[in-house]
């Protein structure tokens, strides 16, 4: 089924107002979830909203909390989120990173005691839309086994890198082959994953999303490489923010909250003139896109370019929402 942007946003806002959020905060939060869903990140928009409400009701999310700056070192700042709403706080932090980059050429914000930021790509895109390179990542609950283990000891720790091309080029990836949100998308669609997603109970690679959702044996992206990347991203976020690590969140909290996040903006325009920038970036993109196709019916993919098409389609034709997800939203 498809619903209009306003219909979806109004449902989000209704639920938030019922949980005693202020009118202003409910409007801002509902807009963020609707924007994420309309942009095509269904797994971290409408699909994730019931989980957000669960954490709100548990007290993991403190809606009226105000993030505060703890430390300033020129182009680097350390902030404390105080468990405020994750996606709204993340937007503010990337805005601040952009402000610092406009002054220093680069801006780095390290955030502690944060909540799940929903679609991490939103914040890389936010920087790229303003002409900056945007880089951000978060640590997370231990929901993935490190390479060589069965037991979950590392987070999926999503990493986003966005470049101000036309259209925007952006990598938005967890350190696993699939996030749990994308496993849900495949399961709801009644299909297997396109590549191996994890291990079954016997240790064999599997593309069955329901098996991996149940046994939580995600496959790290690039095998040992994704495992290693997850670990170092966790270390850096923990050090820069003086916040909680994956092990601390996993062992000391009763759910995924008080995570650590990093937001980086890099100003490009003072490093290279606009004409040269466009020529160099277009040459890279053209070189990639004109490679001989392995499948003549499938175009060569540049990361993030599909979101421009998805957004246009959803704006014109309504936003796809799984009927089961919509029914659940209506009951909240």
Curated annotation (Swiss-Prot):
The EC category is oxidoreductase
Gene3D superfamilies recorded for this chain? 1.10.1530.10, Hypothetical oxidoreductase yiak, domain 2 (3.30.1370.60), Hypothetical oxidoreductase yiak, domain 3 (3.30.60.50)
At which positions is NAD(+) bound?
168-174, 224-225, 304-306
Q: Which reaction does it catalyse?
A: 3-dehydro-L-gulonate + NAD(+) = 2,3-dioxo-L-gulonate + NADH + H(+); 3-dehydro-L-gulonate + NADP(+) = 2,3-dioxo-L-gulonate + NADPH + H(+)
* Keywords, ordered alphabetically: Cytoplasm, NAD, Oxidoreductase
Annotated EC: 1.1.1.130
Q: Which GO terms describe its cellular component?
A: cytoplasm
Enumerate the subcellular locations listed in this protein's record, separating them with semicolons. Answer: Cytoplasm
Active site per database record? 44
Keyword check for Oxidoreductase, yes or no: yes
Q: Name one GO molecular function term.
A: NAD+ binding
The record ties this protein, via HAMAP family, to:
Diketo_gul_reduc
Q: What does this protein do?
A: Catalyzes the reduction of 2,3-diketo-L-gulonate in the presence of NADH, to form 3-keto-L-gulonate.
The cross-references to PANTHER family, in alphabetical order and at most eight, read: 2,3-DIKETO-L-GULONATE REDUCTASE (PTHR11091:SF3), OXIDOREDUCTASE-RELATED (PTHR11091)
Q: Which NCBIfam families match?
A: PRK13260.1
- Write out the similarity annotation: Belongs to the LDH2/MDH2 oxidoreductase family. DlgD subfamily.
Q: What is this protein called?
A: 2,3-diketo-L-gulonate reductase
- Gene label: dlgD
